[in-house]
Amino acid sequence: MKNVKYCNTPSSACLNADLIIDMATLTGASRVAMGTEVPSFFSNDDDLAMKLIDLSQKTGDPLWQLPLWENYSGQLNSAHADFKNIGNSMFGGAITAALFLQKFVKDVPWIHVDLMAWTRANKFCSYEGGEA
């Protein structure tokens, strides 16, 4: 194992954010749970989550909230580090991944969208011929 002392923090990391929204193709577990058309999201702020759900319904862009189920957070415990980045179980991977990310969010409203990076069907206004 190698340790690194990071001496050049980007200025954006020093900002005091009012809101954090991250979007990532983080887990296959979300795709298994939600299928190929509905991204899941997690939030530490219920009011913010409801606003996102409302916007999703108004725009026709589907989203579905999954829980930050704290009972799974013990799966991230490690004897050799503060925590690890993957749970002990082959189940609940989207939740444990979001719980991992949440460890880096302080007292800031936060949304994590775990989305699938490609589509299986050509639809109106979608790219044709390839998958990204």
Can you describe what each PLM-predicted range is?
Residues M1-A132:
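A generic structural signal for tightly packed, nonpolar segments enriched in small/aliphatic residues
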